[in-house]
Amino acid sequence: MDYTLTREESKLLMELLGLPMEQYGNFPLMRKAFLQKCKIMHPDKGGDEQTAKMLISLYKKLESEVKSLNTDDGFSTEEVCKISKLTYIKDWLTCSFGSFSCKCLFCLLLKSHKQELTKKPKVWGDCLCFKCYTLWFGLQYTVDIYQSWQALIGVTLFKNLNI
């Protein structure tokens, strides 16, 4: 996802879709906005032909490069969470600094981020921790932004969290 569109193309696509940049990567929402904007921008409906072509080309470019996260709809017993009470975050002040002993989803994703030692930089989608979310989208590390991250993580399949 990090090499599909340039930063300028990403910003232009999100502007054409009428979505904020922090929703980049939320493919169900982007698809819905794309279909709505295609109806509005279509030249037969009184829209601008060049703008419609730009929207379609950028969206198709993004769509062609992104691998589907949902390769299958089934699940197995190995994918079931072994933690009985999974919470998003236990305590903002403690967990925002990374508590090693905490078992909340926020800390588990942060630990997963720290454990992967690769030479390539982390990108949103490979690592879904809050730190990567704020870095990737250029957001501040605040409780309000955390709530938008939580909503996105809430609709992500557990097996795609990479923990």
Curated annotation (Swiss-Prot):
- Highest taxon of source: Viruses
Assigned keywords, A-Z = Acetylation, Activator, Early protein, Host cytoplasm, Host nucleus, Host-virus interaction, Metal-binding, Oncogene, Phosphoprotein, Transcription, Transcription regulation, Zinc, Zinc-finger
- Pfam families (alphabetical): Papo_T_antigen
> What are the recorded GO MF terms, alphabetically?
zinc ion binding
Zinc finger intervals, H1C3-type: 113-132
GO cellular component labels: host cell cytoplasm; host cell nucleus
InterPro entries, A to Z: DnaJ_domain, J_dom_sf, Papo_T_antigen, Papo_T_antigensf
| Record's subunit section | Interacts with host PPP2R1A; the interaction inhibits PP2A activity.
Q: What is known of its domains?
A: The common region of ST and LT proteins comprises the J domain. This domain is essential for multiple viral activities, including virion assembly, viral DNA replication, transformation and transcriptional activation. This domain is also required for cyclin A-transactivating activity of ST.
Q: What does this protein do?
A: Promotes efficient viral genome replication by accelerating both G1 and S phase progression of the cell cycle. Inhibits host PP2A by binding to the A subunit, thereby displacing lower affinity regulatory B subunit. Inactivation of PP2A in turn results in the transactivation of cyclin A and cyclin D1 promoters. Late during the infection cycle, ST may induce dephosphorylation of host MTOR, leading to the inhibition of cap-dependent translation. May establish and maintain high levels of viral genomes during persistent infection in cell culture.
Q: What is this protein called?
A: Small t antigen
Species, as recorded:
Squirrel monkey polyomavirus
